[in-house]
Amino acid sequence: MKFGLTSVALGLSLAIGANIAAGLTKEKSKPPVPFTEEYLASDSNISAGSAIWADQCRHCHGAKAYPGKAPKLRPNRYKPNFVYRRVTDGFRKMPAWIDVYTDEERMQIVAYILSKQFSP
């Protein structure tokens, strides 16, 4: 009986440890398809991203990312995958939007943020 309880305890410890380790080594979020110049320059993608920004993001970031509750964005310093990861996974006080917006919608937000229409 003692051997059985020890085995169960060891098994549970290993399972819990594996779950913790999996959370610590979470893979970075990637868009379902690579960002292309054409995608980022598409008027329909920029327009859709602008609508999402106006509906959701501006409440913290402001109309064009400044002034708002959140820090000022500097889109000319960002790469598309970096912005996508921030929108998808969140960062510090910014919530993750992975369960709210589709992959395509999050990609459209990126297109808008990196567009000339967005830049403050």
Task: Show where each model-derived region lies.
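Positively charged n-region of N-terminal signal peptides that target proteins for export
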Residues: 1-5
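Bacterial N-terminal signal peptides
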Residues: 9-17
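C-terminal capping alpha-helices of c-type cytochrome domains
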Residues: 23-26, 87, 99-120
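Mature soluble domains of exported/periplasmic/lumenal proteins and thiol-rich metal-chelating peptides
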Residues: 31-38, 63-66, 77, 103, ...
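Gly/Gly-Pro-rich "capping" loops immediately C-terminal to redox-active cysteine motifs
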Residues: 39-50, 62-93
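Thr-Gly-centered strand-to-loop micro-motif
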Residues: 60, 96-97
